[in-house]
């Protein structure tokens, strides 16, 4: 189970009612909080997720190279405080709508990269914990389109 909200971001192995194990969690700020803070810095009203999606469609996702804290560390833990700080610094330099669109697109791309990698690690851990012989992670299906769909539906 991947839980993402304004207050929590966690990977859980749910074995049954009341039986779960946390595989990873945010060590600082939740992803939903990062979305809301980014939206506020871009002048978007709450809730920010759907509006960031709209702005991101008009932007260049490669314009800003945003940090991915603990991205290359093993495990399923997440960190978004450094990303929020980078957005704060860049937002102070924005002068045009296009720069705003580009920052929204870069922010969304960075989040997708983080969640894709950490979700893949979580699936691997799930396979180990449940002694699965077959691969559960659907390599080709669980791609960018699915993550984009998750963002649209649940943020």
Language-model features: locations:
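A contiguous, well-structured pocket-lining segment that forms one wall/lid of small-molecule binding clefts
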Residues: 54-136, 145-147
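Short amphipathic alpha-helical segments
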Residues: 16, 128, 151-152
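Short beta-strand scaffold segments in enzyme catalytic cores
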Residues: 9-13
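Glycine-rich phosphate-binding loop plus the immediately following alpha-helix
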Residues: 15-60, 84-94
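Short glycine-aspartate micro-motif
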Residues: 1-3
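N-terminal low-complexity segments that are often proline-rich with Ser/Thr-Pro
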Residues: 142-154
């Amino acid at each position: 189970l991947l839980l993402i909200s304004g207050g929590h971001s966690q990977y859980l192995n749910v074995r049954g009612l009341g039986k779960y194990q946390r595989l990873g969690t945010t060590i600082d700020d939740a992803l939903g909080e990062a979305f809301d803070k980014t939206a506020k810095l871009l002048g978007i009203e709450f809730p920010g997720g759907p509006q960031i999606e709209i702005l991101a469609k008009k932007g260049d996702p490669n314009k800003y190279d945003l940090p991915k804290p603990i991205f290359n560390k093993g495990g399923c833990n997440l960190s978004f405080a450094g990303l929020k700080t980078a957005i704060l610094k860049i937002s102070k330099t924005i002068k045009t709508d296009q720069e705003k669109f580009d920052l929204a697109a870069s922010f969304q791309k960075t989040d997708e990269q983080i969640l894709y990698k950490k979700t893949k690690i979580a699936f691997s851990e799930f396979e180990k914990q449940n002694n699965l012989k077959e691969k559960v992670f659907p390599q080709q299906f669980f791609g960018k389109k699915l993550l984009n769909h998750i963002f649209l539906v649940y943020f």
